[in-house]
Amino acid sequence: MWRLKIADGNNNPYLYSTNNFVGRQTWEFDPNYGTQEERDEVEQARQHFWNNRHQFKATGDVLWRMQFIREKRFKQTIPQVKIEDGEEISYDKVTATLRRSVHLLAALQADDGHWPAENTGPMFFIQPLVICLYITGHLDRVFPKEHKKEILRYLYTQQNEDGGWGLHIEGQSIMFGTIMSYVCMRLLGEGPDGGLNGACTKARKWILDHGSVLASPSWGKIYLTILGVHEWEGCNPLPPEFWILPSIFPMHPAKMWCYCRLIYMPMSYLYGRRFVGPITPLVLQLREELYSQSYNDIKWKSTRHLVVKEDLHYPHPWLQDLMWDGLYIFTEPLLTRWPFSKLREKALKTTINHIHYEDENSRYITIGAVEKSLCMLACWDEDPDGVCFKKHLARIPDYIWVSEDGLKMQSFGSQLWDASLAIQALLATDLNHDIEPILRKGHDFIKASQVKDNPSGDFKSMYRHITKGSWTFSDQDHGWQTSDCTTEGLKCCLLLSKMSAEIVGEKMQPEQFYDAVNLILSLQCKNGGEAGWEPAGESNWLEFLNPSELFEDIVLEHDSVECTATGMQALVIFKKLYPKHRREEIEKFLKDACGYLEKVQMQDGSWYGEWGICFTYGTCFALGGMEAIGKTYENCEAIRRAVNFLLTTQRNDGGWGESYRSSPKKKYVPLEGNRSNLVQTACALMGLIRSKQEERDPTPLHRAAKLLINSQMENGDFPQEETGGVFKKNCLLHYPMYRNIYTLWALGEYRKKVLPQPTKV
């Protein structure tokens, strides 16, 4: 039986940590763990998800929840409440709903203070890892029998009815997701016509019906090439010389978005090395299975720009294809011949040094799932028995997650993000007696997770920004600063610093607050918006160089509504507690941020959310930022327009429901059937409360609160619905804790600001 372990280094000599592994979450399979009744409960959850897999793609993430509830002997003792039609919502019923949520949240908190949860959704994380482990010969050791069984379960469960897989779990089938999943199944031991319900046969038919893997997008071509099922001649060039360009060059790596930079870094190394894994009998079989013509007859040069329409979210401009052709026809032949080959040798050495630097500064976690597999493979290519590769292997468990739909690979974990939101939700309830022990543990986790130092050495020469004082998305070992995680972590610690240390523990030192503020200020763009990871400032025209057909806006760092709004909230709280520290800079930040929000507001009054779905989510955040600086419905046209947007998109049942398709389409798209989504309902409710809707007409608030209250389940949980997160406008991320956090937060604000408190007799 599977179980989750917290903050455990497992005494592995190749693991090291900056804070004793606080926040680390790893799964292990123990054949002797659990009773038969508990195993049956897990199987029931798996079967239930399987039976409904085509209606609900996002898991409830119930396996670890079952484990924690058992271990803590949790039982919901507060009676469930419902609001009948025509009934006025009472303060006491909302209180009961909140207390039920809080009691469950307490049971789900890990010993180190965070809330475990999967952070998955893309259908291109686990597959490249399996490919790289197969190439290196470590697949069976890293993923023994039970691991393989659960990976296959995941692939079967998430397969679409037409036989393919999407870019993410809710997406329509595309070539990239389908070829990666097909190859993964074959590497895990399934035959060409194997798999549950003919999974491999259906997938191969989809691939061949859509032009074969020759029509794969560029990432698919690269992964197949390193496996030996495609040729480098059929890929656009990724010259490692990119990493030795002069800094004045417009396309210098220092000017790129960090994820783009760190994905193409190992890709360019492998390209420069013309790396290909061992050509095994299975690889030769795949060459026969995945093409509609003989492998040896393929004219690879003519296939470089082929991409099936299902994968073409961002078509290359003709000028970009002309650039690739120039590199392919003229530059590459030169760089592979003496004396220019000396330049390639230098470039490869520089590139692998950058890879090692990033590995060391993330404790071999790397910045994310895509980079992890590629950097690990580059290290293996350099030295198959080297320490670097062994350190990479030791960090694979940090990425693995097991749920009712099987074993998958995470983006890298949302521990800090979820914990900081959960603590603010708890504070909104004002249930001091119920939440005090939870707050103390959560406070300890957030304090222990703040990054204490900048990257090692001359980090600017390695294209890195400051990290000291920041918080990451996951844990301290990860090491990569993000502005919104820093602002949410800062908000929590500032709010908790106002409470008694006997209740929530010692507050952070002022210098730690100052370091966080310094990072937030450093990431404001010229237009007033806040960037996510590193300062943004390059001209947007460089986005025409986006080499990926699957994503949008990946070349440069960009600002976002959410990062800007949370930065405003955090700095307003900070300014009240530390009024003399960098006051003028903070006031300028707030003024410019307000101007940015007003400028990027959509015509219908909404704001586009970069990290959640989509206009509902972005509008909630923007209203929070505007409220923080004193903007009101009466004095701000932007707020009036935003309120109108929320009121006009409310559903008949009192909720809100927006489709993930809003993100790629960049226009509001409701859920099919005018359904509501509880997380979006909670976000919209909070947004309206931030505009003081209760002073104008509380009816929409009551209707939303009624839906939330009546949706609470017997144990205090809320049902899992559609996936809640998104990135780069076209791919989803699943945040299962959102259903607990945002519902609690919204109802806490509703009780505090909308309902009159009963008079004490």
Curated annotation (Swiss-Prot):
Q: Which GO molecular function annotations are given, in alphabetical order? A: beta-amyrin synthase activity; oxidosqualene cyclase activity
User: GO cellular component terms?
Assistant: lipid droplet
Q: Which GO terms describe its biological process?
A: triterpenoid biosynthetic process
PROSITE patterns (alphabetical)? TERPENE_SYNTHASES
Q: What Gene3D superfamilies does the entry give?
A: 1.50.10.20
Recorded catalytic reaction(s): these are: (S)-2,3-epoxysqualene = baccharis oxide
Q: Where in the chain are disulfide-linked cysteines found?
A: none
Q: Which residues form the active site?
A: D484
**NCBIfam families membership:** squalene_cyclas
What role does it play? Oxidosqualene cyclase converting (3S)-2,3-epoxy-2,3-dihydrosqualene to baccharis oxide, a triterpene with a 3,10-oxide bridge in the A-ring. Also mediates conversion of other triterpenoids at a much lower level.
Output this protein's name. Answer: Baccharis oxide synthase
Source species, please? Stevia rebaudiana
Q: What is the lineage of its organism?
A: Eukaryota, Viridiplantae, Streptophyta, Embryophyta, Tracheophyta
